[in-house]
Amino acid sequence: MPSKTGVGYITVSGFVVTKAATTWAPPAAYQDGMIGPHWSKGWIIEDCEISNSKCAGISLGKYYDPENDHYFTNKYVKSPTQMERDAVCRGQYHGWLKEKVGSHIIRRNNIHHCEQGGIIGRMGGVFSIIEDNHIHHINNMMELGGAEIAGIKMHAAIDVIMRRNHIHHCTMGIWCDWEAQGTRLSQNLLHDNQRPAFAKQLKGGMMCQDIFVEVGHGPTLIDNNILLSDASLRFATQGVAMVHNLICGALTCVGEGTSWRYTPYHMPHRTEVMGFMTILHGDDRFYNNIFVQKWPSEDFITMHDSDDGFDSENRKVGTWMFDEYPTYDEWISQFDFTKPADMKKLESVHFDHLPVWSEGNVYLNGAKAWKHEKNGFVSSENVKVELTEKDGKYFLDTNIYEILEAFSGRMINTEVLGKAFEPEEFFENPDGTPITFDTDYFGGHRGAKVIPGPFAEKEDVGKNVNICTAF
C-alpha cells in the first residue's frame, strides 16, 4: 500500500503476496491490508494470489484520520454508530468524492486463508467492480472475532458491482454494511459459508451466512446468484431486491438487528450525503426466485465462546418472515392526499414498516411463501440440491426443473422494481440506465418464457456453475 493517499491509477498484476502481519481494520480507523490503493482512485488489482494475511488481504478502505481513528476504543464517550456517522461526514471534508476516490477493479484473484477478510474497505471502494475472484477459507483459524469478518466486507459500497465471484468456506460470504446504495451482487456462487457445528461464536463475532446487508436504505440488488449455505441473507436492512436467485438458506434477522441506528443515504450515484434515517424495514422486493428448504428448518443454536450464552437464529426458508409487512396498497392507503397533511396523525405511519412486493417465486421442500405472494409456485415434492466438485469444476445435482415443469414468471426490469424509499433512487445501473433481467447466471439470454431462478433454460443445470475465471 502507498504510504500516502491519492496515489491513483496503479495496476498490480500477477503477484503472489503472502504471510503479512496486517493490523485489525475496523471501519472508523486506518484500514491496513496486504495490497490496497490507500484512499485513491482507479487501481486495478488482478491475477494475484493473496493469502495468509493476519487480518485483511486487499483493503479498499479508509485513510488515517487522527481525530477519528479508533475513537470508540480510545475514548468511547460517543457511541460507535455516532463515530461512524462522523467518519462519513469527515470523509467528505477529506475528499470523499467520485472524482477522487474509488472506481477500482479487483478481478481474477485467488484470495484465501486471511483471518479478517479477503477484501475489506470503508468508503474507499465506492464505484468499484469486484469480479471473477475466488475467495475462500477466510477466518478459518477463528483467532479473531468482531464485526468485520467476511470474504468481502464493505462499508458504503455505493455503486459497487460484485459479480461472478466464487466464495466459500468463510465465516461469512459477503457483508455490505451501511450505505449499500446502488450495490449489485450478481452471478456469484456462494456455499459452505458457515462454521462447523462444533465451533463456538467468538466474543464480538457474528452469525454466519452467504450475504449480510446491514443498516442500509438501498437500492441493493441481489440477482442471479446461487446461495447454498444454511443462511442465505441476513436482512437487518431495507431497500433490497432479490431477483432470479437460487436460495437454499433462510432469510434471517428480518425486522431486527438495527435498533435505533440511523445511517446515511446519498445523492444517486454520488457520495454526497442526502440524509440520515433509522431503518424502518421493508421496502423489499422478491421476484422469480427459487427457495428450497435444503437444510433442517429448526432454529440454529450457536454457543458463545466467552460466556455461557448462545444465539438462536431462524432456518425456515422462504419469504414468510415478512407476513406482518404491508402490501403497497395497504401502506399507501394510510395517506389521504385529498386532505392537508397532519404531522401528528402520520407519525406512527412514518415510523412503521414499509411495503413488500413478492411475485413469481418458487417454494420447494417446505419453504414457505409470504402470505401476499402473487403467482407463486409451491410444491411439497422432495427436492435435492447438491453441489459436487470435479477437477475445479462445480455442478448442481438437482431435480428442481423437473418439478417446475411449465411454471414461468414475467420479465422483471427497473420499472417493475421502482425506487428505494429513502434515497428515491431506482434499482438501475451505476450510469443511471435501466436494467432488464434478460441475462442469466451464465450470461445467456432469457426469452419469452421466463423461468424462475438463475438459469434461462432448464438444460443449464448441467453446466459448470463455477464461472469465476480466477486461476
Spell out what each predicted region is.
Residues 1-11, 27-40:
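Extracellular beta-strand-rich solenoid/capping regions of secreted or surface-exposed proteins
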Residues 448-471:
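Short, surface-exposed, low-complexity cationic segments
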Residues 22-38, 54-410, 415:
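Glycine- and acidic/polar-rich repeat regions and solenoidal domains
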Residues 11-26:
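Active-site-adjacent substrate/metal-binding segments within catalytic domains
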Residues 409-448:
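Active-site and glycan-interaction determinants of carbohydrate-active enzymes
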Residues 40-48:
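Transmembrane beta-barrel wall of Gram-negative outer-membrane proteins
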